[in-house]
Amino acid sequence: LEYGIPEFRLPKDKVVAAEIASVKALGVKIETNVIAGRTVTIDSLLDEEGFAAVFVGSGAGLPRFMNIPGEHYNGVFSANEFLTRNNLMKAYRSDYDTPIHAGKKVVVVGGGNVAMDAARTALRLGAETTIVYRRTEKELPARAEEVHHAKEEGIQFAMLTNPVEVI
């Protein structure tokens, strides 16, 4: 909640902080930076620590790369990395002088909700933003309302297009 979801969709200081406080008020113990199976086992939490239940929140999955030349150049990020950097460095706040790198023109490859979030975030950082997707608009996996908002905000779409190299 803190890192991958843009501020414009989920205000951290208001919504996330209040949700965490309400969960803690219910008596839930939150442990972060724990690697299940390494630093602690599920069995030890249930048997030795006396927990009645364990929730494993594994976070977002690993990004999928296209295996094309140039995709590991400086300034090329996975959408999750870009969103995390933006949130951690509070680039969405005008009173912060955040050194996040977003070029004057940004291309986001993909058509899911995370791609829409990354594109809309880049737009808010002042970039002319285009979403490139290999299929038709009807086949976009993002929710229709996310696509609508992206278009409404001025994001361009290049459909039936797939990059072969980053130059």
Functional labels for PLM-detected ranges:
Residues L1-G4, H72:
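Gly-rich Lys/Arg/Thr-decorated short loops/hinges at beta-loop-alpha junctions or inter-strand turns
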Residues V16-F65, E71, F77, E81, ...:
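A Rossmann-like FAD-binding core segment of flavoenzymes
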Residues G110-G112:
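Glycine-rich Rossmann-fold phosphate-binding loop(s) that bind the pyrophosphate
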Residues G4-L10:
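Short glycine-enriched, charge-decorated loop/helix-capping segments at active-site entrances
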Residues A115-M116:
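N-terminal Rossmann-fold NAD(P) dinucleotide-binding loop
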Residues A119, L123:
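Gly/Ala-rich phosphate-binding loop of Rossmann-like dinucleotide-binding domains
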